[in-house]
């Protein structure tokens, strides 16, 4: 696999980063590699007998092979469904890069590929002191951009790609995720995205509200 680890970000919140990340995990596994997901910081967690768990992080865990320990996959599990900075403050947690570095190293030792899913859109901060760019830079990861295909997506995608580049980081690919079945001229929009984003398209995930991640993996085009 050309990229043994990468960071999945999005053009906004709720545009399908987890859908894309789980599809990526299954696509990597279909090539015969072991692959695990990571959700460094997750808010909106629910209480379980095993502790606070997040729906997206659980989806990443289910798509992983081998399946990592939840606390390693999601080191910061925050109860409130808020921006991480606010959710962490609510429970008196101070986010630090060190636990994330340690967890990532453990996951790298467990599998050939690690898919790290970010929070919200690229510019969403992790804390008052940390941006996602700080984490990505520390872990030395390239970035894959998930574009939620809806009205305004070309602007959002170009701004996000420019922000990633301005942070001195490398965006190695983008994925079109169709999230609005009523969108007009969707083919033209995806064509325009391809013309304006200076990185290869890693796939186009169609609108399938009840599809399983393993089935969506067929729509991912991993680089050789």
From Swiss-Prot:
What this chain does, per the entry, is described as: Catalyzes a mechanistically unusual reaction, the ATP-dependent insertion of CO2 between the N7 and N8 nitrogen atoms of 7,8-diaminopelargonic acid (DAPA, also called 7,8-diammoniononanoate) to form a ureido ring.
Ordered alphabetically, the record's keywords are: ATP-binding, Biotin biosynthesis, Cytoplasm, Ligase, Magnesium, Metal-binding, Nucleotide-binding
Q: Which family does it belong to?
A: Belongs to the dethiobiotin synthetase family.
> What NCBIfam families does this protein's entry cite?
bioD (TIGR00347)
- Which positions are annotated as binding ATP? 14-19, 56, 117-120, 177-178
What quaternary arrangement does the UniProt entry report? Answer: Homodimer.
Q: What is this protein called?
A: ATP-dependent dethiobiotin synthetase BioD
Q: Which organism is this protein's natural source? A: Xanthomonas campestris pv. campestris (strain B100)
Q: Where in the cell is it found?
A: Cytoplasm
The residues responsible for catalysis, as annotated, are 39
Listed cofactors: Mg(2+)
EC no. given is 6.3.3.3
Q: Which HAMAP family match?
A: BioD
Task: Quote the cellular component terms of the Gene Ontology held in the record.
Answer: cytosol
Q: Which top-rank group of organisms is this from? A: Bacteria
- At the top of the EC hierarchy, this enzyme's class is ligase
Look up the record and give one Gene Ontology term from the biological process aspect: biotin biosynthetic process
| InterPro entries per record | DTB_synth_BioD, P-loop_NTPase
Q: Which reaction does it catalyse?
A: (7R,8S)-7,8-diammoniononanoate + CO2 + ATP = (4R,5S)-dethiobiotin + ADP + phosphate + 3 H(+)
Sites binding substrate sit at: 43
Q: What are the protein's GO molecular function terms?
A: ATP binding; dethiobiotin synthase activity; magnesium ion binding
Main location per the UniProt record? cytoplasm
């Amino acid at each position: 696999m050309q990229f043994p680890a990468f960071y999945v970000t999005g053009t906004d919140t709720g545009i399908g980063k987890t859908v894309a990340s789980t599809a990526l995990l299954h696509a990597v596994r279909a090539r015969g590699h072991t692959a695990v997901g990571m959700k460094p910081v997750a808010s909106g967690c629910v209480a379980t007998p095993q502790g606070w768990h997040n729906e997206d992080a659980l989806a990443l865990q289910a798509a992983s092979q081998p399946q990592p320990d939840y606390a390693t996959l999601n080191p910061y599990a925050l109860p409130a469904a808020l921006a991480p900075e606010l959710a962490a403050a609510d429970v008196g947690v101070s986010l630090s890069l060190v636990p994330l570095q340690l967890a990532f190293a453990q996951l790298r030792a467990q599998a050939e590929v690690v898919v790290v899913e970010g929070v919200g859109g690229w510019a969403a901060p992790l804390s008052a002191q940390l941006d996602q760019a700080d984490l990505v830079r520390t872990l030395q990861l390239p970035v894959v951009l998930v574009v939620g295909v809806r009205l305004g997506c070309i602007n959002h995608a170009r701004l996000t790609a420019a922000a990633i580049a301005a942070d001195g980081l490398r965006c190695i690919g983008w994925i079109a995720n169709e999230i609005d079945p009523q969108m007009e001229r969707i083919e033209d929009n995806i064509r325009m995205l391809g013309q304006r984003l200076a990185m290869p398209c890693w796939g186009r995930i169609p609108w399938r509200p009840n599809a399983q991640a393993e089935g969506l993996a067929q729509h991912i085009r991993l680089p050789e």
